[in-house]
């Protein structure tokens, strides 16, 4: 979001997950995951469950690196402690830093709240006009998609945020499906993602299944989808693995790209193919 607001040069450090735009990867990392790399979905779920049941953190903050950066503002989130360092951990460390930075936590549950966070963050960073402009551009793109698919048949779309165990996409994802011209029979707009069974997914009679394992890129999502290909094929639906990390998991301006991607999957005859 900071880069989209034109503040890239002011970004002193990022998390280990920050990979867009490419220059974000060049900044020092101040977090790391304690979950080993290379695990499949079931192994990740098991590792997360074991650590959280023991009250152990899933991420670590590099407070020594933070201390040397002399930052004025720390941007964090409290939407999901499985996805990033907890807000409480960030706040505690911020209070101990010599620069005494302000901390802003972005915690949206809906697409509207994501867009509202753009001017909120921009104001905190001293560029309010950039935030208003970016939010207006995002809203205009969403309205354009909504107009393009208005009146078209709405396929039943199930978004799988995880495949082992199954999680149904929540928060802003059901709204993204609706804006793109689909009907989400299982997602609950503005609510957290939730577990489900294959039987529940089958009973929803989806026309389309979008496989968007949280935090995984397109290649990883395709590999995870292939692991469950037999079960997915039994649904009789079109199955599309997507780049969740880029377009669905992270509450930022690229969610608009995600809506455009969904609209192209659901109604390719009505919307231009999105540019990636």
Predicted segments with their positions:
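N-terminal ligand-binding lobe of clamshell/alpha-beta domains
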Residues: 1-276
């Amino acid at each position: 979001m900071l880069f989209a607001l034109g503040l890239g040069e002011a970004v002193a450090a990022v998390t280990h997950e920050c990979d867009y735009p490419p220059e974000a990867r060049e900044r020092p990392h101040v977090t790391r995951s304690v979950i080993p790399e290379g695990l499949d979905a079931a192994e990740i779920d098991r590792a997360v469950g074991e650590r959280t049941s023991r009250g152990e953190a899933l991420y670590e903050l590099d407070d020594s690196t933070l201390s040397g950066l002399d930052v004025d503002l720390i941007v964090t989130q409290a939407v999901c402690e499985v996805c990033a360092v907890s807000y409480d951990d960030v706040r505690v460390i911020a209070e101990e830093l010599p620069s005494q930075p302000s901390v802003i936590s972005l915690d949206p549950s809906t697409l509207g709240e994501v867009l509202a966070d753009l001017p909120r963050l921009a104001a905190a960073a001293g560029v309010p006009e950039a935030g208003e402009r970016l939010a207006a551009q995002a809203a205009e793109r969403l309205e354009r998609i909504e107009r393009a698919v208005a009146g078209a048949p709405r396929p039943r779309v199930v978004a799988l945020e995880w495949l082992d165990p199954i999680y149904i996409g929540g928060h802003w994802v059901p709204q993204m499906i609706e804006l793109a011209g689909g009907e989400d029979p299982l997602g609950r707009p503005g609510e957290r993602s939730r577990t489900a069974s294959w039987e529940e997914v089958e009973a929803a009679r989806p026309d389309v299944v979008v496989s968007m394992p949280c935090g995984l890129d397109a290649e990883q999502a395709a590999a995870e989808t292939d692991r469950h290909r037999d079960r997915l094929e039994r649904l009789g639906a079109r199955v599309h693995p997507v780049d969740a990390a880029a377009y669905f998991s992270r509450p930022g301006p690229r969610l608009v790209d995600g809506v455009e991607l969904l609209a192209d999957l659901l109604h390719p005859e009505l919307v231009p193919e999105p540019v990636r």
